[in-house]
Design a protein with these regions (language model features):
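C-terminal substrate-binding subdomain of Rossmann-fold SDR/epimerase-dehydratase oxidoreductases
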Residues: 1-77
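A short, N-terminal "cap"/entry segment at the start of jelly-roll beta-barrel domains
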Residues: 71-103, 116
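Double-stranded beta-helix
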Residues: 78, 170-208
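Short acidic-glycine-tyrosine-enriched beta hairpin
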Residues: 141-163
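N-terminal juxtadomain amphipathic helix
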Residues: 210-288, 451
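A short glycine-rich, Lys/Arg-flanked "PGG" loop and its adjoining helix->strand segment in the class I
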Residues: 388-403
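Conserved beta-strand signature within the Rossmann-like core of class I S-adenosyl-L-methionine
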Residues: 401-409, 602-603
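Short, glycine-/aromatic-enriched active-site segment of Class I SAM-dependent methyltransferases
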Residues: 406-429, 433-435, 440
């Protein structure tokens, strides 16, 4: 739709530069194939047809459209074969290509090797995986805020990568791939080679990916997992830095969905010893958490007729003993915590709450007294890669008439309320009641009761007994129907969630920038794991001068990735501070308790619109 008869490449380039000063122009010495391309048609003009836009306006409009849209979708995507025909001879799969090809490259790759580490300025890359498996890593080079994203290509997958997307392949099995090419290997007319080197994955990252990637569902074993969302490469959320220049390992933070059992899990497994050997999250820090477990203890004592001298209570992942302390205060004698973090187990034992320091696994089972009447596990089933082993151990410790009470951050709340910042590497799994029932069905056990609770921005509490003959309360059926109606079994529900989260990132970046321009430097409040996830995903660093934290163990540390210092609120002298509350689930408590340091508190959730 151009009003000019002919135009040269140089003219188009200069108009692009005019409308977007960030464009870099590079002249080449290549032979120009012709002096200009005819873009209009005289015969067409004679019919009375008129061009609406001139070239300058058209380019400006395109650039504005590109700027307003975050190019997240379809930078690289995987397509399975369609219209399959299967008989006794085998299988035929068909792949419809968006464009014709004129060259096929046959490539063999050994396990534990890297290929690609490049991008194509002009062409799409299309690779068909014939045999084996590889992890594909890609990044949009046209968007400076883009994340590095990974996904898995299995046999029979067609992987399509867009131009100007850097990509690499880490082979986890001996593999054969076909490279399907349109065009020549070089574009001499434009002075640009077909393939430009761009090292996206080095040897260290290759080893990290190979050692940590999770290819199958840990609940049912399905290896065809679907990507929900990528929050980019992120540091371990609670591994705070001792100084600003300290390096930290970065791992993909990506959630996958299993269409077989509806489990959601991360794409990688980080060695738990790296996260839990010296754990910074102390549950008793907030009054809200303490009151929650006091109320829970009183509820369980009444509901299950627990006796102070007889009833035996175990808490798995007991932290500093927060869930057992109310029982101790009510004179319960037989209580035991199981906690892998040395510092927290030591703290609990110091406070006279008997705590076993270690992971709950087969090796440690023989060291722990059995026949518990109640076994508590608060946010523990999110923290284990060895779910089946842990579940077997819990059932092994339980009295035949005992009850397991599990609290988990509720996936339905995460999806509804867009609380993506509850996603971090400690949380291997993200549970719905639907997926929990599918999981515990494997152990001849019954979830007989379920209830929503308010912790962590929305959680679920379930009650489990051994055997299949237990009466199931209405609460289970009601919540299952709510999940079904919401679309917990429909992958589109998860795709819609991801789209909304990418939009939130754009809004928060804009609103924090406006807030800083209006009020100067911003001070954060609270450095929970969710703050690490959010700040790194938003790429917010210099905009926040420091973060106040009530947990003394964190003072003098830095948030990994964004490297924002964590300080005591005693450091603040000016009541005119703008406080951005990152621990948004404790917003009201923080606001009420800190009127002396500021009269302006903003919940980070309010910046998402």
């Amino acid at each position: 739709n151009l009003s000019k008869e002919s135009v040269t490449v140089k003219e188009v380039a200069e108009l692009c530069k005019k409308n977007n000063p960030n464009v870099k122009l590079e002249a080449t010495k290549d032979e120009v194939p012709n002096l200009g391309y005819t873009l209009s048609n005289k015969k067409l003009l004679k019919t009375g047809f008129k061009f609406l836009y001139n070239l300058d306006f058209s380019i400006k409009e395109m650039i504005q459209n590109w700027i307003s849209n975050e190019n997240i979708e379809n930078l690289e995507f995987i397509r399975a074969g369609e219209k399959e025909f299967i008989d006794e001879r085998g299988k035929i799969s068909n792949y419809e290509l968006p464009e014709s090809i004129n060259l096929v490259g046959y490539i063999e790759s050994k396990k534990n090797t890297i290929r690609a580490n490049h991008f194509h300025p002009v062409q799409e890359q299309k690779v068909l995986s014939v045999k084996g498996q590889f992890i594909s890593i890609y990044k949009d080079l046209l968007n400076t805020n883009s994340n590095k994203i990974t996904h898995v290509a299995n046999e029979g997958d067609l992987i399509i990568t867009k131009p100007n997307v850097a990509h690499a392949m880490v082979f986890t099995k001996d593999s054969i791939i076909l490279n399907l090419v349109r065009g020549e290997r070089e574009h001499k007319n434009y002075g640009i080679t077909h393939t430009m080197k761009h090292v996206l994955v080095n040897e260290d990252e290759k080893k990290l990916l190979i050692n940590s990637y999770k290819f199958e569902c840990r609940c049912c074993g399905n290896n065809k997992l679907k990507r929900i969302i990528s929050l980019g490469y992120q540091p371990l959320a609670n591994n705070l830095l001792n100084n600003k220049n300290q390096n930290c390992e970065m791992y993909p933070l990506e959630m996958n969905y299993c269409s077989n059992c509806h489990n959601c899990q991360l794409s990688v497994i980080v060695d738990p010893k790296k996260m839990f050997s010296n754990y910074m999250y102390v549950s008793s820090t907030t009054k809200t958490s303490r009151e929650h477990f006091i109320g829970a203890a009183k509820k369980y004592i009444k509901e299950f007729k627990l006796k102070p001298k007889k009833s035996y209570i175990i808490d798995v992942g007991s932290n500093d003993g927060i869930a057992l302390k109310p029982f101790k205060d009510l004179n319960f004698k037989k209580i035991l915590g199981i906690e892998p973090a040395k510092n927290l187990a030591k703290l609990a034992n110091k406070n006279k709450i008997k705590t076993f320091n270690g992971f709950l696994e087969k090796e440690s089972l023989k060291k722990i007294k059995k026949n518990a009447n109640i076994i508590l596990a608060s946010n523990v089933f999110a923290h284990s890669d060895k779910l089946k082993e842990m579940a077997q151990c819990i059932f092994g410790l339980l009295h035949k008439n005992g009850v397991i009470i599990i609290e988990i951050q509720y996936l339905l709340n995460t999806l509804k309320d867009l609380t993506f910042d509850n996603i971090y590497h400690e949380h291997y799994n993200y549970w719905s009641l639907t997926s929990l029932i599918n999981f515990f069905n494997q152990f001849d056990a019954t979830i007989f009761k379920a209830e929503k609770i308010n912790t962590h921005g929305g959680s679920l509490r379930i009650f489990i007994k051994k055997g299949k003959k237990n009466k199931i309360e209405k609460s289970v059926k009601i919540l299952l129907k709510e999940e079904e109606d919401f679309g917990i079994k429909n992958f589109k529900t998860y795709q819609d969630f991801a789209k909304k989260i990418y939009k939130i990132r754009k809004n928060v970046k804009k609103n924090i920038s406006n807030l800083e321009k209006k009020n100067g430097k911003i001070i954060g409040y609270g450095s929970p794991a969710k703050a690490t996830t959010a700040l790194n995903f938003f790429n917010v660093s210099d905009e926040i001068s420091c973060i106040i934290e009530d947990n003394k163990l964190k003072h003098g540390k830095f948030v990994p990735g964004v490297k924002i210092p964590i300080v005591s609120k005693n450091k603040l002298k000016n009541k005119k501070n703008t406080i951005l509350v990152l621990a948004w689930n404790f917003f009201e408590e923080i606001k009420i308790n800190n009127k002396n340091i500021s009269n302006k508190f903003i919940n980070i959730k309010d910046l998402e619109q």
